């Protein structure tokens, strides 16, 4: 019986990782379990750093030491025992990929099945004449080769190995024994009687040289014989290399399988690699499968409205100023161009000569020496600089490849059709449309019985995977969407969909706030999807703050009671029904005892607006919108409705550019912003880390460390010893411990085991040398101060205003629990964002700042949201403007103004469907069809 109990539960004994206080917890298996609690209370530590880490460690330890050296190493978490643990998979908020070749389709493997479908039942069409492609006989091939240019020298090749791994000694020996003398190996001609060594782990291509011949009537029979031999050797394929004098040779592919007789072109047999943009077989030869190319941007090289002698040509005056400036002046003098004029004031001939050159020799002086050089034009000069590996990224733009129009594939691959659609059509349609297409069997009724039999299992896999994406609220995305542009919440839901598609059972899934980025409309969809994953026999542990998700859980674990040192305990575990009867913070917000309400501030007397005009980006078409200033404005709408496109991709970069050059207000990409005179800066506060190394911490980021170092340097003992403030920095020589160089830890490489961080035995983790630690303020050394929580430090430095005022802002944003010297890499995204807010609060404010935040409630408990709301409104009370992209109804209902985008995502979005106060948006929801308004109406009842 005892055994059964253990197997039905995961039992954690003595968990002490980070701030966890010797936790004992029993979690039921095969259920939907939610971990909740304040930000920094220890939820993620228990879920990810303890349960998942131990599950992963046990799996890796079961592998051989040889295999382990190639895998990420996972250390043992600080826990006495975990029983009943199953294999664990973590689905966190990290962006899926930074690789420009990753797309939604490749991540979910849907693209792999599409490639297979196109290779097996695709109909080939000629990309030139659009006629269907048919087979080519041996006599047709012979005729085409014989009609090549008279006296051309050609090599007829039989492809033996195509881009495969192996040493292929047997193949090479077989060719030699059958009388072949030469072969092309990886593009280089070799003699087969010589020793050839091929690396078995690398891909190789081997082509037998069947004959080398000159095109003329006398050699017709010889060509025919060679062609027949090559076709037989290579199962109906051959290559012809046409040699050219003083130019690279030309390759032509011929096949008995596929050809367009009208255009006299042969095509290779279709295979999945023909549709892979990561393979030379399928990738566009111009952009190499990226879909985009970097090229010089005239608008970045040249300012047409600035006089030529005042730096209008940025690329010339940006590098080697003297040389290019002298050459440019020589060109203008020779062509009679007045450099006091702007580019737009020159005539067409002068403009063309300036940009593209006119072949004239220009005389000029450089370093007191007379020089004569041809004027190549600004464009060519810029390209020459690029070849010299000078950084011209400031003058380049990423543009859609003109050859493949951004679709990444060769023309021959893009012309293949399935059910009347090309691959590009499937990649550019919203996933919702792709799902409905594959869910309609009539689209494939044209297939014969054999084709149906081949296509059926492939279509089933595609339909399932596309449905799972649609089901988690991602129907607005496209399969061709670049993975780098996907948010953390979207990438997590993609991986949830992929896991459902994998069909795994008996797995422990650990998820980090899957509701992030989801509108209330889609939350129930997500919960149903998670339920489907759980019903397959899996255990779900979800770190979450969303009310609906918590209420739908089978089992809730609340970590607290507070955060940091005041957290790390299980304050509740049990059913939702039991939770609602509890009297701690989470339960109080769920049962309605406590509510998040806006602080009382006087509304601004002056009413100013920021108006964005002519927005055309992604799914937004010709949009103009007014945003009130000196208010808390929420941008709302379902996922994919255009919120980020409008604010982060349009308003933010445009406003930053214009405010940086505030003398002249002009439009960028057609976008015009009216009302910027009411602002002096735009600040974007995201959830990116405040530092990427352990040397970054809240004290250094907020600037309080500078004041603390000055205070220590002002101590009598420090002055006697001549210590300056730099003595108390762990980043420079002098006061720091040199053994660990101010890290406090030393990393020991363990090869087959995880690297171990060992406390420095010289400074014992203090980061400073003993002489520095002898200097004390109120009996505390600099190391003692860095180990204090913000709350403790505020009390300690209460009589030092310059320090106390900065610490007070950290307290105001609810971060009293973090330590001053806490490693920046251990801070959550929500904590990092609030530290940035605290830094802004501590600055002397002009009251003319526009703050932009993207989902600031990510990772925040109801109590934390309350703190955040107070901070946002306090910044507005100072006369600043606050623009927040948000789905959280507690923030939305307490905003001054709402701009709701929609009505749906993707092509069905991109419009402002409702705007006004929260009450106005709620009252007009039936008229505007605003989903936000409908949920807001329920919330405001």
Where does each model-flagged region fall?
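Conserved phosphate-binding elements of NTP-dependent enzyme cores
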Residues: 1-941
């Amino acid at each position: 019986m005892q055994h059964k109990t253990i197997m039905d539960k995961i039992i954690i004994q003595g968990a002490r990782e980070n701030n966890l206080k010797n936790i004992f917890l029993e979690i039921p298996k095969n259920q939907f379990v939610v971990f909740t609690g304040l930000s920094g209370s220890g939820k993620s530590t228990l879920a990810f750093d303890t349960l998942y880490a131990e599950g992963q460690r046990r799996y890796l330890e079961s592998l051989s030491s040889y295999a382990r050296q190639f895998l990420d190493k996972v250390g043992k978490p600080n826990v006495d025992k975990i029983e009943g643990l199953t294999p664990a998979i973590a689905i966190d908020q990290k962006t899926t990929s930074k690789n420009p070749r990753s797309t939604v389709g490749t991540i979910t493997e849907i693209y792999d099945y599409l490639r297979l479908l196109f290779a097996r039942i695709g109909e080939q069409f000629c990309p030139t004449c659009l006629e269907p492609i048919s087979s080519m006989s041996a006599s047709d091939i012979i005729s085409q080769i014989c009609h090549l240019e008279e006296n051309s020298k050609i090599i007829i090749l039989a492809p033996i190995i195509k881009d495969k791994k192996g040493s292929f000694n047997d193949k090479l020996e077989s060719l030699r024994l059958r009388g072949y003398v030469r072969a092309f190996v990886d593009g280089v001609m070799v003699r087969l009687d010589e020793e050839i060594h091929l690396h078995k782990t690398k891909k190789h291509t081997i082509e037998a040289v069947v004959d080398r011949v000159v095109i003329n009537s006398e050699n017709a029979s010889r060509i025919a014989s060679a062609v027949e031999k090559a076709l037989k050797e290579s199962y109906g394929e051959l290559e012809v290399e046409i040699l050219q004098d003083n130019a690279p040779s030309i390759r032509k592919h011929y096949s008995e399988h596929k050809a367009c007789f009208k255009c006299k072109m042969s095509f290779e047999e279709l295979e999945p690699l023909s549709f892979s943009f990561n393979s030379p077989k399928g990738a566009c030869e111009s952009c190499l499968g990226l879909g985009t190319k970097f090229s010089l941007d005239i608008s970045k090289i040249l300012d047409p409205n600035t006089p030529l002698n005042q730096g209008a040509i940025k690329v010339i005056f940006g590098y080697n100023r003297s040389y290019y400036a002298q050459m440019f002046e020589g060109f203008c003098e020779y062509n009679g161009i007045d450099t006091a004029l702007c580019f737009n004031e020159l005539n067409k001939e002068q403009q063309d000569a300036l940009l593209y050159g006119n072949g004239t020799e220009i005389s000029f002086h450089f370093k007191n020496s007379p020089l004569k050089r041809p004027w190549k034009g600004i464009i060519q000069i810029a390209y020459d600089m690029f070849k010299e590996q000078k950084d011209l990224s400031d003058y380049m733009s990423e543009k859609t490849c003109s050859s493949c129009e951004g679709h990444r594939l060769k023309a021959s691959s893009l012309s293949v059709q399935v059910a009347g659609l090309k691959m590009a059509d499937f990649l550019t349609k919203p996933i919702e449309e792709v799902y409905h297409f594959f869910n309609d069997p009539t689209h494939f009724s044209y297939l014969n019985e054999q084709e149906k039999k081949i296509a059926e299992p492939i279509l089933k896999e595609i339909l399932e995977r596309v449905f799972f994406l649609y089901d988690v609220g991602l129907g607005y995305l496209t399969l061709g969407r670049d993975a780098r542009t996907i948010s953390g919440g979207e990438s997590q839901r993609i991986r949830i969909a992929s896991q459902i598609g994998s069909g795994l059972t008996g797995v422990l899934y650990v998820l980090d706030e899957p509701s992030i980025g989801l509108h209330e409309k889609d939350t129930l969809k997500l919960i149903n999807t998670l339920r489907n994953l759980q019903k397959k026999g899996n255990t779900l542990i979800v770190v979450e703050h969303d009310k609906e998700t918590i209420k739908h859980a089978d089992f809730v674990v609340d970590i607290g009671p507070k955060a940091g040192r005041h957290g790390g305990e299980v304050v509740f575990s049990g059913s939702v029904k039991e939770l609602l009867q509890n009297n701690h913070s989470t339960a109080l917000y769920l049962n309605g005892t406590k509510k998040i309400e806006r602080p009382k501030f006087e509304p601004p007397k002056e009413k100013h607006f920021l108006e964005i005009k002519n927005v055309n980006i992604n799914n937004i078409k010709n949009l103009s919108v007014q945003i009130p200033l000196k208010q808390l404005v929420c941008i709302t709408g379902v996922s994919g409705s255009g919120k980020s496109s409008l604010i982060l991709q349009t308003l933010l970069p445009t406003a930053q550019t214009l405010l940086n050059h505030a003398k002249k207000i002009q439009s960028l990409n057609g976008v015009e912003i009216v009302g910027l005179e009411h602002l002096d800066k735009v600040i974007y506060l995201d959830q990116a880390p405040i530092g990427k190394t352990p040397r970054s911490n809240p004290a250094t980021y907020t600037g309080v460390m500078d004041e603390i170092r000055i205070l220590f340097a002002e101590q009598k003992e420090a002055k006697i010893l001549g210590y300056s403030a730099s003595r108390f920095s762990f980043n420079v020589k002098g006061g720091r411990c040199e053994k660990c160089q101010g890290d406090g830890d030393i990393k020991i490489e363990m090869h087959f085991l995880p690297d171990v961080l060992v406390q420095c035995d010289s400074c014992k983790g203090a980061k400073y040398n003993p002489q520095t630690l002898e200097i004390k303020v109120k009996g505390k050394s600099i190391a003692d101060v860095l180990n204090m929580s913000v709350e403790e430090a505020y009390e300690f430095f209460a009589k030092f205003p310059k320090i106390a005022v900065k610490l007070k802002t950290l307290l105001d944003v609810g971060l009293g629990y973090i330590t001053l010297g806490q490693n920046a890499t251990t801070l959550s995204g929500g904590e990092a964002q609030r530290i940035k807010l605290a830094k802004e609060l501590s600055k002397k404010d002009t009251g003319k700042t526009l703050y932009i935040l993207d989902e600031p409630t990510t990772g925040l408990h109801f109590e934390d949201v309350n703190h955040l709301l107070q901070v946002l409104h306090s910044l507005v009370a100072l006369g600043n403007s606050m623009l927040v992209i948000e789905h959280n109804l507690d923030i939305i209902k307490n905003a001054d103004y709402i701009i709701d985008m929609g009505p749906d995502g993707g092509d069905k979005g991109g419009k402002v469907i409702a705007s006004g106060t929260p009450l106005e948006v709620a009252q007009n929801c039936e008229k505007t069809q605003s989903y936000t308004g409908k949920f807001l109406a329920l919330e405001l009842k």
